[in-house]
Structures are given as structure tokens and as C-alpha cells.
Amino acid sequence: MISRKTITDIARKIADSLNPEKIILFGSYAWGKPDKDSDLDLFVIMESTERPIKRAASIRRILKDGYVPMDILVRTPEELRHRINIGDPFIKKILRDGQVIYARDSA
């Protein structure tokens, strides 16, 4: 199992390196009961010109020090708005039921 401290540390590393708009925890650690086989699911909202798969790879490189099994989805604010506008049920569930573990100050 992945501790809450480890999840917070991962979010802090991502935030310190990439300054995302928001990091949302979803999946079993956010809305279920994680077990020993559960991975960490993160939805990261940030500006980027890279392709989505490369964005996730960039985050994995930042987190290379400690291995935690995880799935990382990275979308730009524009991509997120588009997915919401077309009614993407998966994105809606993440936004509705996920836990925001980092939000950049807008000030």
C-alpha cells in the first residue's frame, strides 16, 4: 500500500518541478479501498506543448528516485475543457470524485 505521505511527496515533487495547475488523485486511492496491488492514479492539469504520452514520461523521470506503480494522465487546460464539453464520463468522474492533492495559487 502507498502511504498518504508518499502520495503527498509525489505531488510536491511534481509541483516543484513542473508548476502544474492542479493534481488530482483518482482511482482506488481516491474513491475506493486500495489493496496491496493498487496503483496510484494521478490526473495532472498543466500547460504543455508535448504530446500527452511524453508529458507523463517527463513526470516519471522526475519521480525516478522511488518506484511507486502509477498511471499518470496529463492534460492541458484546453484539452480538459474540450473533454468536459464533449461529455467525457471518465474526466467528469475524475473531476467530481477525485481528490485535489495540489492546486497552484492563482495569486
Question: For the regions a protein language model found, what residue spans apply to each?
Answer:
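Short, conserved active-site loops that position catalytic residues or coordinate cofactors/metal ions
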Residues: 38-40
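Short hydrophobic/aromatic beta-strand micro-patches
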Residues: 43-45
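Conserved H-loop
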Residues: 28
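Catalytic core of pol beta-like nucleotidyltransferases
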Residues: 1-22, 31-36, 47-107
